[in-house]
Each structure stands twice: as C-alpha cells, then as structure tokens.
Amino acid sequence: MLTKRIIPCLDIKNGRTVKGVNFLDLKDAGDPVALAQKYAEEGADELVFLDISATEEDRKTVIDLVRKVSETINIPFTVGGGISSVNDVEILLKNGADKVSINSSAVKNPQLINDLASAFGSQCIVVAIDAKQINGNWKVHLVGGKVATEIDLFDWAKEVENRGAGEILFTSMDHDGTKNGFANEALAKLSQTVNIPIIASGGAGTMQHFADAFLLGNADAALAASVFHFQEIRIQDLKIALKNNTIQIRL
C-alpha cells in the first residue's frame, strides 16, 4: 500500500478562505497564506487551493495569492478555479503551483485534459469531479455543484484517465459539509474503475471517517477543509491515529 495523503483544502473567495455546508452559506475561515503555513508546519502532505468564485464569475485565479502561498510552504500545492486553457496553467505553474485542478472546463471541453497532459505531463493535472446521486445513479455536477448533467461519474472518471489526467479529486455533493463521512462505496467503485490516484472529498467529520476513506473507500488521499480550519481535528493527531490503524502515513 502506498503512503496515504492528508490534504487540507483552502476554498478561496475574494482572497479569503471560506467554507460552507453543501457549497452554500460560506463562513470566513481565515487568511489563506497563514492557514497554508500552519498546515505545512503541522504535517499536511499537500494543499489544495480552489478559487471557488473563479469559474462562476469568470474570474482568473488569484495569481498573487498563489505566489504568496507557494513562497510560504514547502509541500506540493494544487490550484484550481477558472482554468480553461494551456496558458492559464502555464501562468499558475510559473507562479509556484505544483499541480492544477480542472473541473467544469474539462466537462465542457474534454480535449483540454489531453492538451494539458501533453504540455505539462499527467503528474500535474488533477481533474476534480463533483457528483451526487440522482435516483440511485451518480451524476456529474458543474459550477460548484449548481448545474446537473446526465454524465455518469464512473464513465467520466474512466474518460479523464484515458485523456491523461494524473489524479481525480472526487467530491460527493451529498456528503460535502455534513461531517457524516465520505462516500466510501462510490470511492471503492472509482478505485476499481481507474488506475490513477483518487482524492476523497466531502464529508470528513471524525478521524474514523478518514480511516474509512482509506480502508473501505480505497482512496489514495483524503481532503477536508472545515475540520482543519476550525481546529476540530489536528493533522498530527489524525496521522498518529491513522498509523495506529495500520494505515501507511507520513508522520
């Protein structure tokens, strides 16, 4: 078993870190640069920085903030939000991002995945997929979960892998912000469907939820926001608990 990763997510709106429940009712969870530094020092394996206003308001990701965050931390760092071209990615990588995450733009223009993988290598291309169950079937949603599609989660995951994505960041819209645990059945099915790493997102509330995502969901990494931002779970404590649960983790 490869070492599992713990990834705090910084949702950014207007230059501040925010976190809502089910993608609505955003609360201010602080300064992104300070939070990034805190997480790096506490032992986070990676960070994800999503400019959640970028796609919706057609605003490009906050380049200055990316630069400041990258100057502050020494762990891998993924940036998403408003990315729709090879040029967008080039700018982000030049300003310190290690990887980029694309979501709505990949669904609207799947060829973008091929183009980015060709230009920069699969290792820095993460495709984020937001999905929820509609009549028992997992369907992909766009624009922060606001727009439903007819696309099947597992078909889309296979396609993004075939097009060159290096990783999938899967958020269950049904679980996001609820703190009731990750979508482990869907995660397990995803891990059987594709051979690239899966990052689990949506539903973290307890340390056991992280263990379940790895042991039941076969996730390669687990991402969370509010439990870290509001210090309900400390990363170091979480990692020790996971290690005690026979999960391979970097302490």
From Swiss-Prot:
Major site of localization recorded for this protein: cytoplasm
Enzymatic reactions: 5-[(5-phospho-1-deoxy-D-ribulos-1-ylimino)methylamino]-1-(5-phospho-beta-D-ribosyl)imidazole-4-carboxamide + L-glutamine = D-erythro-1-(imidazol-4-yl)glycerol 3-phosphate + 5-amino-1-(5-phospho-beta-D-ribosyl)imidazole-4-carboxamide + L-glutamate + H(+)
Catalytic-site annotation from UniProt: D11, D130
One Gene Ontology MF term: lyase activity
One cellular component term from this protein's GO annotations in UniProt: cytoplasm
UniProt keyword terms in alphabetical order: Amino-acid biosynthesis, Cytoplasm, Histidine biosynthesis, Lyase
InterPro entries: Aldolase_TIM (IPR013785), His_biosynth (IPR006062), HisF (IPR004651), IGPS_HisA/HisF (IPR050064), RibuloseP-bd_barrel (IPR011060)
GO biological process: L-histidine biosynthetic process
Enzyme superclass (EC): lyase
Pathway: Amino-acid biosynthesis; L-histidine biosynthesis; L-histidine from 5-phospho-alpha-D-ribose 1-diphosphate: step 5/9
Compartments (UniProt record): Cytoplasm
EC number: 4.3.2.10
Subunit structure, interactors included: Heterodimer of HisH and HisF.
Task performed by this protein: IGPS catalyzes the conversion of PRFAR and glutamine to IGP, AICAR and glutamate. The HisF subunit catalyzes the cyclization activity that produces IGP and AICAR from PRFAR using the ammonia provided by the HisH subunit.
Family: Belongs to the HisA/HisF family.
HAMAP family membership: HisF
Stated name of the protein: Imidazole glycerol phosphate synthase subunit HisF
